[in-house]
Design a protein with these regions (language model features):
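Gly/Thr-rich phosphate-binding beta-strand-loop-beta motif of the actin/hexokinase/Hsp70
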Residues: 33-60
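ATPase catalytic-site recognition across NTP-hydrolyzing enzymes
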Residues: 1-43
Length: 213
């Protein structure tokens, strides 16, 4: 993996690897894998040949703690109704406090379905400013070693590495990802961003402060 053009450094991403078997409060085969502990969700819709991605993040219970990517899902060629039904099933298994949904493009259909059974669902309508805020939030957490995921899911690190910084025609900083066969357009990384939107930049407490534009 090469991080020469990436917003994220490979050395920082490698600190995100964790052995989920050492998480005593997490049992992925249980009806309630985290019991009644709170979780946040993030959804990135499918575009062109990309997968849709949904991630579940367990936020820290104490100030400065770790965010843990508990589960991630990739859905290809599935209708927005089918995807929303899978998320409905997950809402029955986890104690969601926040679900951020990218509604730019095809995500709006999934969002409308989710909102019917989870009114706290938050639409994420990307602007240059909002995308910058969310990328900086992920960078803040990763550099502070406060974001963890299963070491076997190294495609998550690959996805973050494909995110590059650019400049718009008007001179604003922007972020985008090149497409690869393994990561699409960084689908799982973009799914993490709406989920992590529940913690504001510079706020280490894990409280829910959602960016909406």
């Amino acid at each position: 993996m090469d991080d020469t053009q990436s917003v994220f450094r490979l050395a920082d991403l490698e600190t995100c690897y964790a052995d989920t078997d050492t998480w005593p409060d997490f049992n992925p085969t249980a009806d309630r894998p985290l019991g009644n502990l709170p979780v946040w969700g993030g959804y990135d819709p499918s575009r062109s040949r990309d997968d849709a991605s949904f991630v579940i993040v367990a936020p820290p219970l104490k100030e400065g703690g770790e965010h843990r990517v508990i589960a991630r899902y990739k859905w290809l060629d599935k209708s927005y109704i089918w995807q929303a039904e899978r998320i409905r099933e997950l809402v029955g298994r986890y104690n969601f406090r926040h679900i951020g949904v990218d509604v730019t493009g095809p995500g709006i259909g999934v969002f409308e379905q989710i909102r019917a059974f989870f009114p706290l669902a938050t639409p994420i309508n990307y602007s240059v400013q909002l995308k910058t805020q969310l990328v900086l939030k992920a960078k803040e957490l990763i550099e502070a070693h406060r974001l963890k995921w299963d070491a076997g899911q190294n495609d998550i690190a690959h996805a973050f590495l494909t995110i590059r910084q650019g400049v718009t025609d008007s001179g604003q900083i922007s972020y985008s990802a090149s497409r690869t066969s393994a990561t699409g357009h960084a689908d799982v990384a973009w799914a993490n961003l709406p989920g992590l939107a529940a913690e504001a930049i510079g706020q280490p407490k894990g409280g829910c402060v959602v960016f909406i534009q």
